[in-house]
Swiss-Prot record:
Top EC category: transferase
Listed name of the protein: tRNA (guanine-N(1)-)-methyltransferase
SUPFAM superfamilies: alpha/beta knot
GO biological process per UniProt: tRNA N1-guanine methylation
Function: Specifically methylates guanosine-37 in various tRNAs.
Organism: Staphylococcus saprophyticus subsp. saprophyticus (strain ATCC 15305 / DSM 20229 / NCIMB 8711 / NCTC 7292 / S-41)
Taxonomic placement: Bacteria, Bacillati, Bacillota, Bacilli, Bacillales
A single Gene Ontology CC term: cytosol
Length: 245
């Protein structure tokens, strides 16, 4: 996979791209990353990348020329996805991460200032993505978050493929509780089932915990999750137990 970042602050990416999973993916030649400072593609002697909005208003708007020129400098493929980081976009989800991980090439356009000239959005972008209902100073941090979420899904990047298959949201549910040594700590014990050695019982317990944890912490996810009769029974038993308690 190749990922390009169009940004005014390429140095922001240095630490993130050279640590942990992202560095491992590059070392394995599974990922190529490139930062493009689109200020270098401005068309006036002052390297101006923004200007006042037509019609008046607050803030500055990113000019089209630097970003169009920067995009033309990038070698693209037939399935290149051009991501515009903006509050108006679709909320980023694990499903989107899964989809983008299938692409050979992803370009992130990371803006600053008040916004983008609309022609950038209309003629260059394939996807508009938001990290949530809040506003950040620029698109660099969201692009880094998305890159981490996407790259860890590439086959062979993680040491254990099962690691991301068990992640929260991968199947529409939150992850089950995890425990490690010691068996007891300050009066708190690990559930006996995890020490039983019975993998069928352990799998059943973990799945029940995923259902219950999602019901308690993110019930909105269950509205989209196709629950079986057995899974609905798990929730109903939990509700009855709460009433008794």
């Amino acid at each position: 996979m190749k990922i390009d970042f169009l940004t005014l602050f390429p140095e922001m990416f240095n630490g993130v791209l050279n640590q942990s999973i992202l560095k491992r993916a590059q070392d394995k030649n599974m990922l190529t990353v490139n930062t493009v400072d689109f200020r270098h593609f401005a068309e006036n002697k002052h390297n101006q990348v923004d200007d006042y909005p037509f019609g008046g208003g607050q803030g500055m708007v990113l000019k089209p020329e630097p970003i169009f020129n920067a995009m033309e400098s990038i070698e693209k493929t037939d399935d290149t996805r051009v991501i515009l980081m903006c509050p108006q976009g679709k909320p980023f989800t694990q499903a989107i991460a899964n989809e983008l991980s299938q692409s050979e090439h992803v370009v992130f356009i990371c803006g600053h200032y008040e916004g983008y000239d609309e022609r950038i959005r209309e003629h260059l972008v394939t996807d508009e993505i938001s990290m949530g209902d809040y506003v950040l100073t620029g698109g660099e941090l969201p692009a880094m978050v998305m890159t981490d979420a996407i790259v860890r899904l590439l086959p062979g990047v993680l040491g254990n493929q099962q690691s991301h298959e068990d992640d929260s949201f991968q199947d529409g549910l939150l992850e089950f509780p995890q425990y490690t040594r010691p068996r007891e700590y300050k009066g708190m014990s690990v559930p006996d089932v995890l020490l039983s050695g019975n993998h069928a019982h352990i799998d059943r317990w973990r799945h029940e915990q995923k259902i219950l944890r999602t019901f308690v912490k993110r019930p909105d996810l269950l509205e989209r999750y196709p629950m079986t009769v057995e899974e609905k029974d798990i929730v109903e038993r939990y509700k009855k137990q709460l009433k008794k308690d």
